């Protein structure tokens, strides 16, 4: 895994190219990610860079976590995240260091992970785009039901994976190969082409794309 940044989704807007083309972009706030720990093979069995992002009141921090952050000399954040890297990459950082938007560049392909917007308990029409039943002509009570969910005594069960009503949204999703359209280093913002899962203010994890294709010469 490559080193990345933890951030927050600000919302969507558009930017215009020199040719006048409109590009829809998602604005991500990726302020300073403060390094809280460097994990090594000798002490932890693997190498990683642990960071925190955002701010949190001291009254909301547990004593073990407060001690962990104090040892690194960093302010408490909303979340702690690890990025597994090789030993050489991990050796470039020390606890207390800041990692910012200069980790990325305009035009770079990235993967963005977020938690989708929760929709609550949803029916099959909303959840899986099922078609509804007939509005009339003999149909009086089953307009939006999914229909049959199985067969008879054989097999006598509902097969796993059957699409039915249930909780929709609020799941972790990763969108791959998004392109960075613009970087605002002063305000620590990334403007990314396209949509990103999650609500405004939701936490996101930005990493270099794992499936990025090299540009042809």
Curated annotation (Swiss-Prot):
Among Gene3D superfamilies, the record links this protein to: 3.30.160.810, Translation factors
What PTMs does it carry? Methylated by PrmB.
- Chain positions with N5-methylglutamine modification: 153
- Recite the UniProt keywords alphabetically: Methylation, Ribonucleoprotein, Ribosomal protein, RNA-binding, rRNA-binding
* Keyword Transport set for record: no
- Annotated Gene Ontology MF terms? rRNA binding; structural constituent of ribosome
Region Disordered: list its residue ranges: 133-153
Q: Where is the composition biased (Polar residues)?
A: 133-145
The domain of life is Bacteria
Q: Name one GO cellular component term.
A: cytosolic large ribosomal subunit
| Gene Ontology BP annotations | translation
Similarity annotation: Belongs to the universal ribosomal protein uL3 family.
Describe the protein's quaternary organization and the partners it interacts with: Part of the 50S ribosomal subunit. Forms a cluster with proteins L14 and L19.
Q: What does this protein do?
A: One of the primary rRNA binding proteins, it binds directly near the 3'-end of the 23S rRNA, where it nucleates assembly of the 50S subunit.
Q: What is this protein called?
A: Large ribosomal subunit protein uL3
């Amino acid at each position: 895994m490559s080193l990345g940044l933890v951030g927050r989704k600000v919302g969507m807007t558009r930017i215009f190219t020199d040719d006048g083309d409109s590009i829809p972009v998602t604005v991500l706030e990726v302020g300073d990610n403060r390094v809280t720990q460097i994990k090594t093979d000798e002490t932890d069995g693997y190498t990683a860079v642990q960071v925190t992002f955002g701010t949190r009141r001291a009254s909301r921090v547990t004593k073990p976590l407060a001690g962990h952050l104090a040892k690194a000399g960093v302010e408490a954040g909303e979340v702690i995240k690890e990025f597994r890297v090789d030993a050489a990459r991990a050796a470039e950082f020390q606890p207390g260091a800041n990692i910012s938007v200069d980790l990325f560049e305009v035009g770079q392909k990235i993967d963005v992970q977020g938690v989708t917007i929760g929709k609550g308990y949803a029916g099959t029409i909303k959840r899986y785009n099922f078609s509804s039943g007939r509005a009339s002509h003999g149909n009086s009570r089953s307009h939006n039901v999914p229909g049959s969910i199985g067969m008879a005594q054989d097999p006598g069960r509902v097969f796993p994976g059957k699409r039915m009503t249930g909780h929709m949204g609020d799941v972790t999703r990763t969108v791959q190969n998004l392109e960075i359209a613009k970087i605002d280093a002063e305000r620590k913002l990334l403007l990314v082409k396209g949509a990103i899962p999650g609500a405004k203010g939701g936490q996101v994890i930005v990493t270099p794309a794992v499936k990025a294709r090299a540009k042809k010469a």
